[in-house]
Curated annotation (Swiss-Prot):
GO terms for molecular function: oxidoreductase activity. To M.thermoautotrophicum MTH238. Pfam families: GXGXG (PF01493). The lineage of its organism: Archaea, Methanobacteriati, Methanobacteriota, Methanomada group, Methanococci. It comes from the Archaea. This is Uncharacterized protein MJ0658.
Length: 318
């Protein structure tokens, strides 16, 4: 049977998509890359002097883009975008008197290259990037799914995928998702920051490969397992759940940790547990700083680690 050869694609052309959403499209034309576009934190405004009302071009400000997305709009960017694109997109940030939870937001389309840290801590929304363009690593808490716009790659939040969008989106190989067990397996070897950011359900994210900054940041439930090494701030501001690194981590593991468990089957770096409040860190090695202290394991600790498949010398940092 040859019918599949002539099967019509369900993908729309970009013009069709834009025309269907013409009342919601905001177009931004860039002459050069600009950092922090569609960044819901405005370059971590609580620790920077960033002004959201800064004009990017033609009366469009950084705040214009964020508010347009919050209202379910479409942002169409023509040109290369800079670093931290779509940072914390879809988060109702507490700093701005929000709930800290996910909010539904709109869509971003890019005809251009994308610089590093695209989608760090991203929690909702959809980003389409022209397949002719490049995306620099590390990326953020995003994963590619099957696109419905011809000629464009489609990215969504890893956290949102495992919590709900797995029902409607199709992962691209070699990544896999087991719907029955709630386990996402990331095999694409793309280096990412903030994997599993703000995870709030009992789902599991497994990364087969190295990760970079802030794995599991602000998690409350679930599990992130990295079969590789991790960068700085692993488990930062962890508020529950479990982060397991089957390798080494860089410095500041468990920074400002509030709850939950971190297991490092290797060296957890320097400044371990800096500004930590609650929670437990297990590691084979690492240099803690006050208020965190280093302890030998008790029988319950040994039994817990054994239940995860670990034996040999570990320390507990609390």
């Amino acid at each position: 049977m040859l019918f599949n050869i002539f099967k019509k694609s369900n993908k729309k052309k970009l013009d069709e998509f834009l025309n269907e959403n013409k009342d919601k499209v905001l177009t931004l034309k860039l002459d050069k890359p600009v950092d922090c576009l569609c960044d819901f934190t405005y370059n971590f405004i609580w620790q920077s002097k960033f002004n959201p009302e800064t004009e990017i071009k033609e009366n469009i400000t950084f705040k214009t883009l964020v508010e347009h997305l919050k209202n379910g709009g479409v942002v169409y960017i023509k040109g290369n975008v800079g670093k931290r694109f779509c940072s914390s997109m879809g988060v109702d940030l507490k700093y701005f008197s929000g709930s800290g939870e996910r909010i539904k937001v709109g869509t971003v389309i890019v005809d251009g290259d994308v610089d590093t840290r695209f989608g760090i801590s991203m929690l909702s929304g959809t980003v389409y990037i022209n397949e002719k363009n490049k995306i620099k690593e590390p990326m953020g808490n995003v994963i590619e799914v099957e696109s419905d716009i011809k000629g464009y790659r489609k990215f969504i939040s890893i956290t949102e995928f495992v919590e709900e969008r797995y029902k409607e989106e199709k992962l691209l190989k070699p990544n896999k998702f087991d719907k029955n067990k709630g386990i996402l397996e990331i095999n694409d070897k793309i280096k990412r920051d903030t994997v599993g950011a703000r995870l709030n359900e009992d789902k599991t994210i497994v990364v087969n490969g190295d990760v970079d900054l802030s794995t599991g940041i602000l998690m409350r439930k679930g599990k992130v397992i990295v079969n590789g090494n991790a960068g700085k701030n692993t488990g930062a501001v962890l508020n529950g759940g479990t982060v397991i690194i089957n390798g080494n981590t860089n410095d500041f593991t468990g920074f400002e940790m509030r709850d939950g468990i971190i297991v490092v089957d290797g060296n957890a770096g320097k400044y371990l547990g800096a500004k930590k409040k609650e929670g437990v860190i297990y590691a084979r090695d690492g240099k803690e700083v006050p208020p965190t202290k280093k302890y030998e394991l008790n029988n319950d600790d040994i039994a817990f680690l054994k239940s995860l498949g670990y034996t040999g010398k570990f320390y507990k940092f609390i």
